[in-house]
């Protein structure tokens, strides 16, 4: 299933496969999340498939760093073990342990 996103308050809920060809649909809603006035933001991965390729890792790292650059704190919830492993293998475990 292609990646989709919905914004529920200050929580970005991701669904589907977080892989390169499917990420375009979630990018615009990710920008909307960063534009919110709240300082505490959340990305919920509990509805996303376990599949996470390097483009998916890069997308998560990019939104995390963009939030930091906007003076906000972004946390991830609902991370599956395969998603966590992909971030660790890629060297980006700091975004989930922050």
For the regions a protein language model found, what residue spans apply to each?
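Short beta-strand/loop segment at the start of cytosolic alpha/beta domains
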Residues: 1-13
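Amphipathic alpha-helical interaction surfaces in cytosolic regulatory modules
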Residues: 17-41, 45-96
């Amino acid at each position: 299933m292609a990646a989709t996103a919905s914004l529920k308050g200050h929580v970005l809920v991701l669904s589907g496969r977080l892989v390169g060809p499917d990420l375009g649909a979630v990018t615009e809603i990710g920008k909307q999340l960063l534009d919110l006035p709240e300082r505490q933001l959340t990305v919920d991965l509990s509805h996303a498939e376990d599949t996470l390729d390097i483009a998916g890792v890069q997308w998560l790292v990019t939104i995390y760093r963009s939030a930091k650059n906007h003076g906000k704190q972004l946390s991830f919830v609902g991370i599956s073990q395969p998603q966590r492993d992909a971030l660790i293998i890629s060297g980006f475990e700091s975004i989930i342990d922050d």
